[in-house]
Design a protein with these regions (language model features):
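Conserved mixed alpha/beta catalytic, RNA-binding, or beta-rich assembly cores of soluble enzyme
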Residues: 7-83, 87-96, 103-111, 117-125, ...
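Short amphipathic
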Residues: 1-7
């Protein structure tokens, strides 16, 4: 399975390329004036510490000096790993010159929307095939 999704907001839009590699998943997220790789998050599913019947995930994050995408890759990799019960690697590179605090808040909202788009595509594939492939 491989696909690309993008948010369609007024501004601060994000795109993601999602690819299944065996049982694992690779997600690249980019947006802004200078898309790049600023951080990488690697997450693995595990039973929740609060409720072993629920799935959770633990992530390790690597971030280049001066980059702030660590928050994005941690959130997305953990959420997808728990949802898919799989190992997930997420890269992100987002850059807008002189972004305001309001702009950062809008980017965070777009990350949530991007996650919903990713999960909807995976759900559609599961429904169509009876399983994720």
């Amino acid at each position: 399975m491989e696909f690309t999704v993008s948010t369609q907001q007024e501004d601060y839009n994000l795109s993601a390329s999602v690819r299944r590699i065996g049982e694992d998943w690779l997600v690249a997220i980019w947006g802004g004036d200078q898309p790049h790789i600023g951080a990488v998050g690697m997450a693995q599913a595990r039973p929740s510490l609060d409720d072993p019947n629920r799935s959770s995930a633990t992530a390790s994050v690597f971030c280049y000096v001066g980059h702030k995408e660590d928050e994005v890759v941690k959130k997305v990799s953990e959420q997808l790993a728990a949802r898919l019960d799989a190992r997930v690697v997420v890269t992100a590179g987002l850059h807008w010159d002189r972004i305001s605090a309001e702009g950062i808040a809008r980017v965070r909202c777009n990350v949530v929307q991007l996650m919903a788009l990713i999960e909807a595509r995976i759900d559609a594939a599961e429904s169509k095939r009876g399983q994720v492939s």
